[in-house]
A protein has these predicted regions:
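Short, structured "edge-of-domain" segments at secondary-structure transitions
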Residues: 2-259
Length: 259
């Protein structure tokens, strides 16, 4: 629940794509057991935007970005977490967008960010979704209220994924129980990630054994029903599972190809 500020040139440049990289504890004063959740380019955002945070226990918080303009080298508390809770997602929002939250047991909720009042940096936050016993949040994203081209991509630990139009997720009130988003079976395993995507995006899948697979979002058909398991997106080695995914926006892919 802490925030740090770091200049890009302070991160050592990797020799190649396959390099191990530099441990974050060597560039940031992270506490034992602390890990980075989200990175935001401060040069690309304006003073009138917010940081919207979502935790594993379903707590949400909206704070003006100006609260984090003057960050000490040692960092600042961004949100006061309950014991055992972890920050899952941090997104930049405009104040009039919708928030989508997805859980491990296949539940999702969409609500207006205006349902969450602006809070000071030291605040705890409020309930974003009412979780069932044993459930936790695994992903969250931002949707424009009038956007028709966005989709929601859900993937399970065994590599089963599906893509739905964002319009399939109807607006609810903050703090509700949500609705069924994914059919979990012994074959699929639990949900590990829920992300907002677009047709021209790519997804980078990272497995527990360190395998990296990159595929086009267009390879996954858009489904009408939400409460389904989807299709096998990638074949993993026996015993391996999906650990996490990263969405690569289409605009960044075009920049790569131009280079």
């Amino acid at each position: 629940g802490r925030t740090y500020r770091l200049k890009a040139y302070e991160v050592p440049e990797a020799g190649s794509r396959n390099s191990r990289g530099t441990a974050m504890v060597n560039v940031l004063p992270l506490a034992v057991g602390e890990s980075v959740t989200t990175m935001i380019d401060l040069e690309r955002i304006h003073e009138d935007v917010n940081l919207f945070m979502v935790t594993e226990f379903g707590v949400v918080k909206r704070t003006a970005i100006e609260e984090y303009r003057n960050i000490r080298r040692s960092g600042l508390n961004a949100i006061n977490l309950d014991e055992g809770d972890h920050l899952i997602s941090v997104n930049v929002t405009t104040g009039n967008q919708d928030i989508l939250i997805g859980t491990k047991l296949g539940i999702a909720i969409r609500f207006s960010e205006s349902d969450v009042r602006l809070m000071k940096r030291a605040a705890h936050g409020v309930r974003g979704i009412k979780l069932n016993t044993g459930d936790v949040v695994v992903g969250a994203g931002v949707l424009n209220a009038d956007e028709s081209e966005a989709q929601v991509f859900t993937i399970s630990e065994e590599g089963f994924g599906k893509r739905n139009d964002a319009e399939a997720y109807t607006l609810q009130k903050r703090g509700g129980k949500g609705s069924k988003n994914f059919k979990i079976t012994n074959k699929t395993g639990d949900v590990v990630a829920v992300e907002v995507v677009h047709n021209d995006d790519e997804v980078m899948l990272i497995s527990e054994q360190g395998k990296i697979i990159r595929f086009n979002m267009n390879d996954i058909a858009v489904k009408k029903g939400k409460a389904i398991s989807g299709v096998k997106t990638q074949n993993l080695d026996e015993g391996d599972k999906v650990a996490s995914i990263a969405v690569i926006p289409g605009a960044e892919i075009e920049d790569e190809e131009a280079e």
